[in-house]
């Protein structure tokens, strides 16, 4: 570029500025949530009860929900450099193909994770924490996992194609809307209001970031491929998983080894049903394409 320092500054300030501002806004949110929740729980324990409920969500449920995203990071490591390279070289069609693959694979992975937590979240929380509240949070937020995971992947892709200013803008608006939602909903509805804030926040950021990425890259939307097919596989897996959960109910009431066995059998069976349903719907095609592009021994371009 003609002015590399200016170009570097245009990249750095939205990214680093976004992190600093997001950190400040998240701190404000974390301070407001217990205070607003204490208003709702004024006659049921006040601030101590508010901190307990908020701690269950933040310290128990959310770490479990975000754990599978670490596995999805492998996909990011494979695709993000290629997305950035295609953008820099002006390879428009290749960029569209890579974005489509990223969105499609993320949809399948996040749908599977959502099904697992929706079906097995309560038994898992009971096994790990002996907490019914944590299980309720896992079950409630599980359907939003595709939005949460897509949001994170799309945010990285936007920065890879030079749209970090837009990502920064949407992040700021999201934080402001979250704070407004906390102040408006928590004093009236308690933790259910905060769960609604999380769900609406995920919907807004996912829609805003994905829409901007598709528009800026010229990629045609294919929501039936990205969300429709994964949702169909998820419904079939959820139906099988719920039936199996009823059959294994005695195992979850037994000693720890039997609980672990029941959870392992149920999780593996649910995963198997999902993969069997998703493979002919497009997962097999994308997995084969990803393997062909990154198989060991493949000559690099």
Cite the ranges covered by each PLM segment.
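Interhelical loop/hinge segments that connect adjacent transmembrane helices in multipass membrane
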Residues: 1-22, 90-93, 215-231, 292
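Short alpha-helical transmembrane segments in multi-pass integral membrane proteins
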Residues: 1-4, 8, 98-118, 124, ...
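Alpha-helical transmembrane segments of polytopic membrane transporters and translocases
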Residues: 14, 49-72, 104-105
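Helix-loop junctions and terminal segments of transmembrane helices
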Residues: 66-90, 96
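Interfacial segments at transmembrane-helix termini and the short loops linking adjacent helices
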Residues: 118-148, 152, 253-257
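Short runs within selected transmembrane alpha-helices of multi-pass transporters and secretion channels
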Residues: 136-162, 166-186, 191-213, 270
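Hydrophobic alpha-helical transmembrane segments in multi-pass integral membrane proteins
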Residues: 182-183, 235-251
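Membrane-proximal transmembrane or re-entrant/amphipathic helices at the cytosolic face
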Residues: 244-301
């Amino acid at each position: 570029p003609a002015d590399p320092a200016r170009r570097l500054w245009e990249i750095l300030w939205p990214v680093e500025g976004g992190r600093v501002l997001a950190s400040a806004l998240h701190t404000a949110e974390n301070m407001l949530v217990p205070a607003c929740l204490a208003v709702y729980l004024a006659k049921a324990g006040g601030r101590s009860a508010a901190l307990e409920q908020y701690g269950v969500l933040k310290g128990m449920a959310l770490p479990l929900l975000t754990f599978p995203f670490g596995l999805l990071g492998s996909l990011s490591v494979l695709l993000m450099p290629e997305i950035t390279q295609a953008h820099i070289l002006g390879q428009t069609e290749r960029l569209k193909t890579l974005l489509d693959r990223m969105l499609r694979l993320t949809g399948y992975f996040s749908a599977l994770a959502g099904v697992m937590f929706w079906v097995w979240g309560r038994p898992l929380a009971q096994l790990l924490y002996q907490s019914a509240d944590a299980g309720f949070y896992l079950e409630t937020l599980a359907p939003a996992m595709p939005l949460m995971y897509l949001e994170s992947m799309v945010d990285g892709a936007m920065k890879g194609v030079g749209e970090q200013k837009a990502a920064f803008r949407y992040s700021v608006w999201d934080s402001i809307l979250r704070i407004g939602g906390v102040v408006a909903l928590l004093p009236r509805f308690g933790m259910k209001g905060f769960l609604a804030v999380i769900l609406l926040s995920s919907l807004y950021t996912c829609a805003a970031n994905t829409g901007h990425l598709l528009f800026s890259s010229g990629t045609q939307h294919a929501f039936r491929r990205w969300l429709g097919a994964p949702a169909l596989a998820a419904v079939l897996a959820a139906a099988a998983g719920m039936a199996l959960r009823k059959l294994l109910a005695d195992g979850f009431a037994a000693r720890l080894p039997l609980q672990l066995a029941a959870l392992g059998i149920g999780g593996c069976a649910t995963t198997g049903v999902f993969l069997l349903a998703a493979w002919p719907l497009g997962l097999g095609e994308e997995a084969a394409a990803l393997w062909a592009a990154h198989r060991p021994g493949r000559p690099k371009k």
